Amino acid sequence: MSDIQEQQASIAITLPDGTVKNVPSGSTGFDIALSIGKRLADDALAVTINGKPTDLHAPVLCDANIEIVTFDSQLGRDIFWHTASHIMAQAIEEIFPGSRFGAGPATEQGFYYDVASEHRFREEDLRAIEQKMLEIAKRNIMLQREEMKRVDAIAYFTSVRNDPYKVEILEDTLKHVDTVSLYHQGDFADLCTGPHLPSTSRLKAVLLSNISSSYWRGDSSRENMQRIYGIAFPSDKLLKEHIARQEEAKRRDHRKLGTELELFMLSPEIGSGLPVWLPKGAVIRSELETFLKEEQRKRGYLPVYTPHIGNIELYKRSGHYPYYSDSQFPPLTYHDEDGKQEQYLLKPMNCPHHHLIYSSKLRSYRDLPIRLTEFGTVYRHEQSGELNGLVRARGFTQDDSHIYCTPEQLVDEICNAIDLTQFVFGTLGFSEVQTRLSMHDPANQQKYGGTAEIWEQAEKDVREAADRMGIDYFIGVGEASFYGPKIDFIVRDALGRKWQLGTVQVDYVMPERFDLSYIGSDGQKHRPVVIHRAPFGSMERFIGVLIEHTAGNFPLWLAPVQAVVLPIAEEVHDYAKTIHTALLAAGIRVEIDTRNEKIGRKIREAEIGKIPCMIIVGQKERDSGEISLRRHRSGDMGSFTVPGLIDILKKEISERT
């Protein structure tokens, strides 16, 4: 073979660590993994070629950056769980012929599939489906990708698969696409872009967790479907570890702790998804609001208040009404005494109200930036199956701020908003925070407001601010709001789960729609840029996540009851009451337990109530004029004078440590 032929038959691949390997042209991801090591080949699920996720057995035909994908990565887990959803669908089809399938994606913690079936699934069905999935896995069925013309795919899903849901996707969502891809596994096939596992045999353990109700395409006017959730793993060991984490998650469930610690309640008489804050929970929320208000005051924010409802024309102008119409409560229709009709909406967003505040008077460039802020309650008609205590509610309060600035001030203001968000998360103990730059999808420009040029500038500004702040980020194409790109902050809690909480959004669109302006140094009108900013996001969601992150063990400054005085015997009650009074006067949230119970029981109940400080008072303490301090989960801390204790607690509270 000539040197030229050898060069043509060999390609250079670059691995993530920078290593360059020469391999034969046409080598697959599996071949490359095997050339690195058998262990990696055994663990390989897929491959990325120049950053694009691809099936493991797809050939690599030219020089490329290559990364072998395993279950250790989020991408690997997504691919594994997506394939598991296909295996579950095949199992359901084999057990319950005639079942049809809607959407079946991977999720953050597993997968689900929406199933249309005459059979009403029960708990025992889940166990049967699990066994069938493991049986399919043992068959070692290869997953085969097939590309076909969209018109041929319509014919296939109409006559062969008899699946009206996939036909609808092909005729609607994919109507502008010429070629689509299918994945076959034995007699089962599904419409899918992939990639997928090379074989069903990679699935070694599975747990189907629950069933909920859903609607086809999330539209309550469409067919009702049954959503089956599950998770799968490449080993039994990983499943056992997952089950252990789930048990811990149950212990930390904010709905459970919210009841036990008397933080909030949910009542069907009030309405689904409308949480009510009880006194202790209200303390937590109030302290968080005070914390942010104090910090915002230092940073030049101006507080405002707006109504809970607004004229529907306001939200049509902003675009929120058509954009959020599927998740809004129906309009309220009002007729005045002259018969004139007006329609109002429960407020879905605070921003249109703030824009009108800005435009209520002439603004100068010398006035900018203007930073308006509000803890504003908004309402979304979430599907009942999606409601989840505080973290997914129909009525919730946003720590919403809108910053109106000149284009020249924009990057500085984004940086300031990022800094505030990082400060909030750091204070509240969220040390692991991922940052996503949520960009628009250029292939779906009609989904967004504004021109392509406006979006290009907005995304450039967001990147510049993120780079200036030195934050690590990843890009989320298609994750932007309809009016602009976002910086989304995703925290990892104590159980390793990810929650999208705070956000910073850039908006060139709303200033156009609301004709916002300021007078520049040249005496002419100019258009401001708007930043939407919410470190907490939703107060309810944030507190729900915080409850689970801390397991209800709040820091002293945030605890609903910061201390409890525990007299050992009745003869020291008077001394205990003087301590209680002194702590109250110092601004400490303190209770006193004068029940005729043994001190051990009082301490145990205070520990269960997660009260940070237990102040033990007996004859010895009374005689010495001191107290004995016990800290929650830490035990005995020694003796202190009352003034000394107050100084220690006030310092810890003021520093919010």
From Swiss-Prot:
Protein source organism: Chlorobium limicola (strain DSM 245 / NBRC 103803 / 6330)
Q: Where in the cell is it found?
A: Cytoplasm
Q: Record's SUPFAM superfamilies?
A: Class II aaRS ABD-related, Class II aaRS and biotin synthetases, TGS-like, ThrRS/AlaRS common domain
Reply yes or no: does the keyword Transmembrane helix apply: no
Alphabetized GO MF terms? ATP binding; metal ion binding; threonine-tRNA ligase activity; tRNA binding
The answer to whether the entry has keyword Aminoacyl-tRNA synthetase is yes
Q: Which family does it belong to?
A: Belongs to the class-II aminoacyl-tRNA synthetase family.
- Gene3D superfamilies per the record? 3.10.20.30, 3.30.54.20, Anticodon-binding domain (3.40.50.800), Bira Bifunctional Protein, Domain 2 (3.30.930.10), Threonyl-trna Synthetase, Chain A, domain 2 (3.30.980.10)
Q: Which GO terms describe its biological process?
A: threonyl-tRNA aminoacylation
The organism's superkingdom is given as: Bacteria
Cofactor: binding details: Binds 1 zinc ion per subunit.
Protein name, UniProt field: Threonine--tRNA ligase
Q: Where is this region: Catalytic?
A: 253-555
Q: Which UniProt keywords apply?
A: Aminoacyl-tRNA synthetase, ATP-binding, Cytoplasm, Ligase, Metal-binding, Nucleotide-binding, Protein biosynthesis, RNA-binding, tRNA-binding, Zinc
The record's principal subcellular location, in a coarse class, is cytoplasm
| Reactions catalysed, as given in the entry | tRNA(Thr) + L-threonine + ATP = L-threonyl-tRNA(Thr) + AMP + diphosphate + H(+)
